């Protein structure tokens, strides 16, 4: 499987685990606030053999692997890669944008993934702006249902700036975030999901749309207001960041 970058040691991305992280190159979205812009070109590939060699030397402390990107479900060798990870008795967490429910269904049926984190790009009517394109709406909705069937999972949305018609840029609103929460509850028929509303943090070297590099981070009061409103629909909502 193509790996664009890797981390040997991570205590944040996989709750309760000491994890190695594999970043896959390439993505079918163009989210303006994406922090992984260098991975999107799908050009760099450091290969996976070095990653597995590291796992074999780190058995005493690493007990999980995070596969993120980019978008991992674009990788044709994702399933064999995960099978090799599982052979080492390691837990697997997958980060996804939900655009390939067929891959998620295969992973679910084979019981290959322990934890899935799915990015929800706000309410459906904003997806063309927040995901940078159209055409994935039905797939993303189907993936909401599938992800909620994994052994452990979370949904998450970054309270990020949205580039609107005419080039106006402002943060996703409380109303729009509430609509995203309603979408999750309606698609899955449940409201007991872990849902994280995440702070947007600008950076100078990696955002896909450079206009956001100087945009402020999400105000604490907006995060608090979003949390209060979204919790009416998804009570297990938490602020992250």
Question: Predicted segment positions?
Answer:
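Canonical Radical SAM [4Fe-4S] cluster-binding loop centered on the CxxxCxxC motif
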Residues: 5, 9, 14-49
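Conserved beta-strand termini and adjacent loop/short-helix elements that scaffold enzyme active sites
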Residues: 6, 198-200, 239-241
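Conserved AdoMet/S-adenosylmethionine-binding subsite of the radical SAM
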Residues: 55-64, 73-215, 220
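Charged phosphate-binding loop/patch that engages nucleotide di/tri-phosphates or the phosphate backbone
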Residues: 219-241
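Glycine-rich phosphate-binding "P-loop"
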Residues: 36-43, 63-71
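Class I S-adenosyl-L-methionine
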Residues: 7, 19-20, 215, 233-234, ...
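Extreme N-terminal starter segment of soluble prokaryotic enzymes
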Residues: 1-3
């Amino acid at each position: 499987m193509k790996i664009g970058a890797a981390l040997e040691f991570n205590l944040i991305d996989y709750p309760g685990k000491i994890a190695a992280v594999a970043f896959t190159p390439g993505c079918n979205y163009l989210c303006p606030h994406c922090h992984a812009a260098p991975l999107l070109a799908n050009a760099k590939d450091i290969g996976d053999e070095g990653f597995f060699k590291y796992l074999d030397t780190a058995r005493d402390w690493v007990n999980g692997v995070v596969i993120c990107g980019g978008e991992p479900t674009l990788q044709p060798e994702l399933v064999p890669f995960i099978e090799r990870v599982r052979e080492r008795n390691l837990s697997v967490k997958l980060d996804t944008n939900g655009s390939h429910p067929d891959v998620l269904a295969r992973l679910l049926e084979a019981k290959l993934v322990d934890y899935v984190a799915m990015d929800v790009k706000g309410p459906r009517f904003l997806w063309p702006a927040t995901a940078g394109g159209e055409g994935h709406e039905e797939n993303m909705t189907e993936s909401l249902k599938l992800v909620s069937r994994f052994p452990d999972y979370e949904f998450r949305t970054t309270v990020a700036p949205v580039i609107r018609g005419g080039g106006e840029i402002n943060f996703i609103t409380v109303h729009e975030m509430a609509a995203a929460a309603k979408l999750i509850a309606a698609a899955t028929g449940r409201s007991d999901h872990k849902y994280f509303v995440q702070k947007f943090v600008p950076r100078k070297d990696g955002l896909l749309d450079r206009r956001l590099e100087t945009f402020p981070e999400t105000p604490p009061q907006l995060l608090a207001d979003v949390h209060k409103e979204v919790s009416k629909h998804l009570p297990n909502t938490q602020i992250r960041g």
